[in-house]
């Protein structure tokens, strides 16, 4: 997970009960952000929906922005965890294809909504821009080993370039509409990503 960038984060949970409350807040915030977008997101309404006082939410996240940053950080950490988990999925080729497939599936759902939201916010808010960049930096770093595994003759600069090309393909594919049979589409995305990494 990227390092916390926001000094307004409250004292995060130090007890099992505190951890549970913090997790409930983050899960509910994620759901509301996916359903209503950032304009419809408020700490007060979130607290009410959880049957908590606003001050209870603010104990963990002093501001709306602090909570949003945490939701985005956690979502990005889950993407990196997918890469790490899938690296043991058979051969280097099978693992790489599994990573690409799983990321495209995730990004066609709620995860894609959240990361698109972060991308939009980052255009206008410096703190979110910093988080957006650090998320992609961590993502690129996690993807380097699977790309290198596809062609171990590549130098570091070429690996970094191919990581970005694979990311561009995987990042953009969930935004496409009318893709026809989803399984065929996913297979083709995997084929193209493999070609980028291997050739």
Regions found by a protein language model. Name each.
Residues 73-79:
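Short, basic, alpha-helical segments at the C-terminal edge of helix-turn-helix-like DNA-binding modules
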Residues 21-24, 28-66, 70:
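Helix-turn-helix
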Residues 108-130:
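Amphipathic alpha-helical segments used for helix-helix packing
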Residues 24, 28-36, 82, 114, ...:
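Solvent-exposed, amphipathic alpha-helical segments
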Residues 70, 81-112, 162-166:
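Hydrophobic alpha-helical connector segments
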